[in-house]
From Swiss-Prot:
This is Uncharacterized protein C20orf204 homolog. Keywords: Glycoprotein, Signal. The keyword Glycoprotein applies. It comes from Mus musculus. Glycans are attached at residue 74. Residues 1-23 form the signal peptide.
Length: 188
């Protein structure tokens, strides 16, 4: 039998070790404002370029502005214009949206599936790599950027479709994060 006093000291250590082993950020949380600053400075331009290559219609001049919409859509994740499917970014909390963005970055890397072959894939790769770097820097995640595994050759159309869905979803999530942050700080 373990003494209660000893268990009282060991349990928090085990939980901390487990959290670090699983990649949980622990006490370090994301700085949403810093993430958004980097989005405005770098990722926004990369995403704009990727969306232009995708032909999805970029109609904006600044990130987060009311007229900044990559595609006609709402911010609930319930789908939107141009026949695009709904995204996985339906959370109402900034932390959940950040996790969605990070996951979508992995999806973008996976959809490129090897060395980028064309301008759209190169632009998507850039968005994914820079998004992950910002998350790692400001959110303390321990995920490292992985080289995409070479998958069996997919049909060109299905690969492009997956890439376009991931780009649409990440654009929606960034916009939703920007909108939630603006509402929270009263800058909307």
């Amino acid at each position: 039998m373990v003494r209660p006093k000893l268990a009282f000291y060991i349990l928090p250590l085990l939980l901390a070790f487990l959290g670090s082993a699983l990649g949980w950020p622990g006490s370090q949380s994301c700085s949403v404002q810093e993430v958004l600053r980097h989005y405005q400075a770098v990722i926004f331009q990369d995403l704009q370029t990727a969306m232009q290559w995708a032909g999805l219609g970029v109609q904006h001049t600044q990130p987060g502005s009311r007229h900044h919409r990559f595609i006609q859509k709402n911010l609930t994740g319930a789908g939107g214009g141009q026949g695009q499917p709904g995204t996985s970014c339906d959370a109402q909390k900034e932390s959940s949206i950040l996790l969605s963005i990070e996951s979508l970055g992995q999806t973008l890397l996976g959809s490129v599936a090897g060395v980028p072959h064309n301008a759209l894939e190169k632009a998507a790769w850039t968005v994914a790599v820079r998004t992950e770097a910002v998350m790692r820097r400001h959110c303390g995640t321990s995920y490292r950027i992985q080289q995409p595994r070479k998958h069996a050759v997919q049909l060109r159309n299905s690969r492009r479709r997956l890439l376009l869905r991931a780009l649409y979803a990440v654009a929606t999530c960034w916009e939703k994060l920007f909108a939630l942050s603006a509402m929270a700080t009263g800058e909307f």
